[in-house]
C-alpha cells in the first residue's frame, strides 16, 4: 500500500478494534450466493479483524484462526495474509467459484477503495464482488472444536456425635 510513511494511520489496539486507521481487507463469498461472505481486515500495525457478512449485516463476534504480517518501509506498508481453508466454510464440489473483494482504507483522507466497484447506495454489497474461478479439488476440512471444562459435586453430612476416635 503505497503511502507517505509519516501519514500512515497505525496504532496498536485489541483484535477486532481500531479499524479507524489504515487497513487492507480481503473478502470471500465462498458459496457465491451474493449474500454470505467472510471478510478479513488487517491494519498497518498488524491488528486483525474478521467478520461474517449476511445480507449486508456484520457479525463481528466471529473469530477465525488466521495469520497476517505487515511491514512498514520507505514506500508505505505491505501485508501478507494466510487464511487456511479450515477458517471458512465452503461447498464440497470439485470445481468452485467464489465472490472475491479487496479493499483499502486510508485514514488521513477517509478514502475507501475496492478492487471491484461497489455502489453503497445499492443493497447487496457482496453481490457486487468479482468472481474468483479455478478453485479445484479442495475438500472442506473436518472441523472439531473441543472446550475443556471441569465439574464437581461435594456432599457433606454432619454427625451430631463428635468423637476423636477413628472408626474403621
Segment roles from a protein language model:
Residues 3-160, 164:
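Structural preference for beta-rich elements and adjacent junctions enriched in aromatics
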Residues 166-168:
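Hydrophobic alpha-helical segments, chiefly the membrane-spanning helices
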Amino acid at each position: 500500500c503505497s503511502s507517505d510513511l509519516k501519514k500512515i494511520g497505525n496504532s496498536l489496539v485489541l483484535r477486532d478494534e481500531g479499524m479507524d486507521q489504515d487497513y487492507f481487507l480481503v473478502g470471500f463469498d465462498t458459496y457465491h450466493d451474493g449474500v454470505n461472505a467472510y471478510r478479513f481486515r488487517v491494519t498497518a500495525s498488524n491488528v486483525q479483524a474478521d467478520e461474517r457478512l449476511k445480507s449486508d449485516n456484520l457479525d463481528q463476534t466471529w473469530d477465525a484462526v488466521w495469520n497476517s504480517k505487515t511491514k512498514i518501509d520507505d514506500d508505505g506498508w505491505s501485508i501478507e495474509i494466510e487464511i487456511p481453508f479450515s477458517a471458512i466454510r465452503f461447498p464440497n464440489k470439485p470445481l468452485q467459484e467464489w465472490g472475491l473483494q479487496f479493499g483499502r482504507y486510508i485514514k488521513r483522507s477517509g478514502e475507501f477503495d475496492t478492487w471491484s466497484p461497489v455502489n453503497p447506495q445499492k443493497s447487496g454489497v457482496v453481490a457486487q464482488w468479482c468472481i474468483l474461478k479455478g478453485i479445484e479439488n479442495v475438500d472442506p476440512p473436518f472441523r472439531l472444536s473441543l472446550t475443556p471444562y471441569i465439574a464437581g459435586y461435594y456432599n457433606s453430612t454432619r454427625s451430631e456425635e463428635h468423637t476423636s476416635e477413628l472408626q474403621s
